[in-house]
């Protein structure tokens, strides 16, 4: 079912192109500037996403038949890639970037990539109608920005994206979706080739052109793979992307409570908090490991709902406890730990009365 030439080619293209992109970007001044939020030193290229994009496009052109949905996928992802590239080179306003994300989502809808029908148990079907339109835009913009926000450490966004794409591809094998398998694995191995140079200490960054492209592709592939499906399968991409989703929602809540703008950057993301205690390389390993666990729970959920749900709950509880302990949202935000303390106090009172 898997054509090994199809996954080897994007890897090799990315491995060959990335050093060329690095040399060109340093020559033309497209390198990351040091500031209070960065964790790197020196001039490092920030348009490594060019290699990932070209590896994907070239391989798709050779191996994948361009039907209507594939055309929508390529056009929409190209809009996001060039949006990120322009932002990497000259900076664009957040509102302009968001507008272009909406346009890219509309392209997907036009080419038939959206959730039109949700099938519930007992044969019940819900025609989403206009809700499908809204859901697709929110989903695409949300996941695209979630992957973009998590791109703060060497190899983090790329590593997590590879894991998510491999899991989606593995699920596609079970579902006998050769089209989905091809797209997911081509993108995964193209990204893997880039990670050869992006692993800590990175000699090149993927930049917004890479993270926006990957985020958009993951959101689009998820819609393409779980279109017109049950609530169970619709939950799978959410489960796979749980870590960046949690990080994004925490950032929104944190910045709202502090009176900051949503697009205003800070150093309170999950990876920043972990790095203070575990260091750069170990933080990336932990984050990718958690993503793999979420992927495992998604895979287990397809095979056995009870086991998958149990794994998911345990991981979510661990992440929530970390968020509260690290004051990621606010020093006063600790509902789960607070609940546990209240239960402990009431238990002591009950035991004292019994005693």
Residue ranges and their predicted role:
Residues 223-230, 315-332:
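N-terminal hydrophobic signal/anchor transmembrane helix of membrane proteins
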Residues 23-27, 256, 322-339:
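Membrane-interface capping segments at transmembrane-helix boundaries
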Residues 20-45, 250-281, 347-354:
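Cytosolic, membrane-interface loops and tails of multi-pass inner-membrane proteins
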Residues 296-314:
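Extracellular/periplasmic helix-loop-helix junctions in multi-pass membrane proteins
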């Amino acid at each position: 079912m898997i054509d090994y030439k199809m996954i080897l080619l994007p890897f090799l293209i990315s491995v060959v192109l990335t050093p060329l992109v690095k040399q060109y970007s340093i020559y033309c001044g497209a390198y990351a500037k040091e500031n209070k939020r960065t964790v790197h030193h020196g001039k490092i290229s920030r348009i490594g996403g060019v290699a990932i994009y070209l590896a994907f496009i070239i391989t798709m052109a050779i191996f994948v038949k361009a039907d209507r949905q594939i055309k929508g996928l390529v056009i929409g992802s190209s809009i996001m890639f060039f949006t990120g590239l322009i932002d990497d080179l000259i900076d664009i306003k957040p509102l302009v970037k968001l507008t272009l994300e909406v346009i890219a989502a509309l392209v997907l809808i036009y080419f038939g990539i959206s959730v039109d029908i949700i099938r519930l148990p007992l044969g019940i079907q819900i025609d989403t109608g206009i809700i499908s339109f809204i859901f697709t835009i929110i989903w695409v913009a949300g996941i695209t920005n979630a992957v973009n926000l998590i791109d703060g450490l060497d190899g983090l966004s790329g590593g997590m994206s590879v894991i998510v794409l491999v899991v989606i591809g593995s699920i596609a094998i079970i579902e006998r979706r050769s089209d989905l398998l091809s797209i997911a694995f081509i993108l995964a191995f193209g990204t893997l080739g880039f990670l050869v140079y992006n692993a800590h200490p990175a000699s090149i960054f993927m930049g917004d052109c890479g993270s926006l492209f990957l985020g958009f592709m993951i959101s689009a592939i998820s819609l393409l793979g779980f279109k017109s499906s049950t609530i169970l399968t619709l939950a799978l991409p959410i489960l796979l992307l749980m870590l960046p989703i949690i990080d994004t929602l925490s950032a929104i809540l944190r910045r709202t409570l502090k009176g900051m703008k949503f697009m205003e950057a800070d150093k309170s993301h999950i990876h920043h908090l972990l790095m203070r205690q575990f260091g750069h390389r170990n933080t990336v390993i932990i984050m990718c490991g958690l993503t793999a666990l979420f992927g495992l729970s998604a895979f287990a959920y397809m095979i056995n709902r009870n086991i998958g749900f149990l794994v998911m709950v345990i991981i979510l509880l661990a992440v929530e406890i970390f968020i509260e302990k690290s004051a990621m949202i606010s020093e006063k935000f600790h509902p789960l730990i607070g609940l546990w303390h209240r239960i402990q106090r009431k238990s002591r009172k009950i035991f004292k009365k019994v005693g």
